[in-house]
Amino acid sequence: MARSKMKPEARKPEARKPEARKTKTGAVQILPFAVRGSKIAGRGAFAVRPIAKGERIVEYLGERVSHAVADARYDDHKGGLHHTFLFTVSRKVVIDATVNGNEARFINHSCDPNCESVIEGGRVFIDAAKPIKTGTELTYDYAYTRDGSETEEDETGLYGCRCGAKTCRGTILAPLSQAALRRRAAAAKRRHHRAHVHARTGQES
């Protein structure tokens, strides 16, 4: 199953004020964003002050589980919904932000993001990839890991992208490698050839 991170869309609460968080030293940290409705999907995180390039914005928190546990909890195809609160940390560990998660789970995907995810020491952080103005929605490229089961229909359907960027690739799945693109093009060519032969044979009979 493509690993993802779910955004709830059933209810649309009022915009939240920036939330205060305590660091490990006990100091109070005010997050540089607030959560409110987003045009991309459900709710999103919006900057409440200018954010400098390279600034560490927030840590992505949640329950740390195995891939097997995550797959048992969520089935994208069965539910007809990709679950975007799951974040792959390694081959063994996934963070499920539906359990003990924080506001980081509301940061939406974009094919032209202003943030990036960084894994350090088994922890996941969201950093600013470029200067961000007040009021701008924070985004990063989910680039969901492909497991080979995704179809072409899944790309724009189940895993379709609505970021609206000029460079939008139409899916939140990771870009296909050049080799995979060549295999897909060859398969499409074979399907077209078979369909042409079938149509011609049918006409002759």
Pin down the residues of each PLM region.
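Intrinsic structural disorder
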Residues: M1-K5, G26-Q29, I51, S205
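Catalytic cores of histone-lysine modification enzymes
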Residues: T25-V118
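Low-complexity intrinsically disordered segments
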Residues: A20-K22
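C-terminal SET catalytic tail plus cysteine-rich post-SET Zn-binding segment of SAM-dependent SET-domain
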Residues: A2-M6, R11, R16, C111, ...
